Amino acid sequence: MIDITLPLTDIHRHLDGNIRAQTILDLGRQFNIALPAQTLETLIPHVQVTSTEPDLVSFLTKLDWGVKVLASLDACRRVAFENIEDAARNGLHYVELRFSPGYMAMAHQLPIAGVVEAVIDGVRDGCNTFGVEARLIGIMSRTFGEAACLQELDALLAHRENITALDLAGDELGFPGSLFLSHFNRARDAGWHITVHAGEAAGPESIWQAIRELGAERIGHGVKAVEDRALMDFLVQQRIGIESCLTSNIQTSTIASLADHPLKTFLEHGVLASLNTDDPAVQGVDIIHEYHVAAPAAGLSREQIRQAQINGLEIAFLSDGEKRALREKVAAA
């Protein structure tokens, strides 16, 4: 189902949600951190979703073991590098990796700005080694409150030239976007793009707020947009993209089944919706699974899957020239 003549992208992919189980074992042993299991096979149920979680917050706890072993900046650098290696193995030409530096720093009180620098270094080394093109999106973890998000923002702004966009993720119901207006004002002043997790746990009003108050150019997940036709019309008119993550939305119980997922409706309506993974290691999936298994199960035709692939590059945070160069590079391969 993947069109090999077109660039393959993943623009909603959490770096800190893609820490390999083997790396968790390795770092746990290196830093003498007690883990819930000592073999890869027995660790998997603790760090990977093996059945549907009751809600988004429960799903997010599966990420915790990955960051609990980040006891040094070198460990952060390693997982960033491995994220690019994984992207290359998946056949991705372009990836946007988003990460929450405060979340990654929390367990071992690492300097947040140091985490940002380590991630930048690891991604740069990975791109040079594996030939994947990547951009970084900084996340503010809303779950930890406004002050913690301000610390994350300050650390990200210290390396603003290496960060492409700002995102807001976490407990959407408990921490609405209205709490973070000044944070996003600073991000826009820095020249960053804006994407926001919205319409995943909360309703269409959360998406409207992300667009009107935070300046979102893209929406992460955005499944509840299907409940508001005027909103879908607005997304089309303003070319605001939806970063769809099919398997993730089932595992978080955001959507009951793939057959119920609104991605097909979005594409039929002309919304610039794309296919993405979200947290590949935690979910036990890759981008190939999303195209070959999840998308057909969600009712997408071959042409709709191809359109979602086209949309992935269309709404990527790249200049028109960079998009054209990537298309030409893939076409010539």
Curated annotation (Swiss-Prot):
Enzyme active site: 200
Catalytic activity: adenosine + H2O + H(+) = inosine + NH4(+); 2'-deoxyadenosine + H2O + H(+) = 2'-deoxyinosine + NH4(+)
Keyword GTP-binding: no
GO terms classed as biological process: adenosine catabolic process; hypoxanthine salvage; inosine biosynthetic process; nucleotide metabolic process; purine ribonucleoside monophosphate biosynthetic process
Cofactor: Zn(2+)
Pfam families recorded: A_deaminase
Cofactor note text: Binds 1 zinc ion per subunit.
Keywords, in A-Z order: Hydrolase, Metal-binding, Nucleotide metabolism, Zinc
Binding site for Zn(2+): 12, 14, 197, 278
GO cellular component terms listed in the entry, alphabetical order: cytosol
Residue positions binding substrate: 14, 16, 170, 279
Keyword Repressor: no
InterPro entries (alphabetical): A/AMP_deam_AS, A_deaminase, A_deaminase_dom, Ado/ade_deaminase, Metal_Hydrolase
Alphabetized Gene3D superfamilies for the sequence: Metal-dependent hydrolases
A GO molecular-function descriptor: 2'-deoxyadenosine deaminase activity
Lineage: superkingdom: Bacteria
Top-rank EC class of the record's enzyme: hydrolase
EC number(s) recorded for this UniProt protein: 3.5.4.4
Residues the UniProt record annotates as site (Important for catalytic activity): 221
Role of this protein: Catalyzes the hydrolytic deamination of adenosine and 2-deoxyadenosine.
Family: Belongs to the metallo-dependent hydrolases superfamily. Adenosine and AMP deaminases family. Adenosine deaminase subfamily.
NCBIfam families: aden_deam, PRK09358.1-1
Name the UniProt record assigns to this protein: Adenosine deaminase
Species per Swiss-Prot/TrEMBL record: Salmonella gallinarum (strain 287/91 / NCTC 13346)
Higher taxonomy: Bacteria, Pseudomonadati, Pseudomonadota, Gammaproteobacteria, Enterobacterales
The encoding gene: add
